[in-house]
Curated annotation (Swiss-Prot):
GO biological process, one term: maintenance of CRISPR repeat elements
Sequence positions that bind Mg(2+): D33
Transmembrane segments: none
Descriptive protein name: CRISPR-associated endoribonuclease Cas2
Gene transcribed to yield this protein: cas2
EC number: 3.1.-.-
Subunit description: Homodimer, forms a heterotetramer with a Cas1 homodimer.
UniProt key word Magnesium: yes
Cofactor: Mg(2+)
Length: 113
């Protein structure tokens, strides 16, 4: 698969499912606050398989419903009571503007494991 810059990845045209009329992918933002270093690193590794790290404790991704379900299932198995993990789903056309230390990142299509 060809590599795309971070900017190209998030500005891909969204495909509409003809049968249901729904948009095929949604923008997802995952933020977290985990005090244990080992657990925090483990979660970051999980999230890196789905999207881009944009801050120390924040990842962005464009996911299908199925991919989102896999992500939620992995986080559900991972999370414990003292963790604070939030998943924000933005459906439809989402414009992302970044300032400051935002940088373009090249990445290949993500592999789920």
């Amino acid at each position: 698969m060809p590599t795309r810059s971070r900017e190209e990845y998030f500005n891909l045209p969204l495909k509409v499912d003809e049968s249901s009329g729904t948009i095929g992918k949604m923008f997802v933002l995952v933020i977290y606050d985990i005090s244990d270093n080992r657990r925090r690193a483990s979660l970051a590794k999980i999230l890196a398989g789905f999207g881009y790290r944009v801050q120390e404790s924040a990842f962005e991704a464009m996911l299908t419903k199925g991919q989102l379900a896999k992500l939620v299932a992995r986080i559900d198995r991972f999370a414990i009571d003292c963790d604070n993990i939030r998943i924000y789903k933005i459906r439809g056309v989402a414009a992302v503007t970044f300032y400051g230390r935002g940088r373009l990142v090249s990445a290949e299509e993500f592999v789920f494991f």
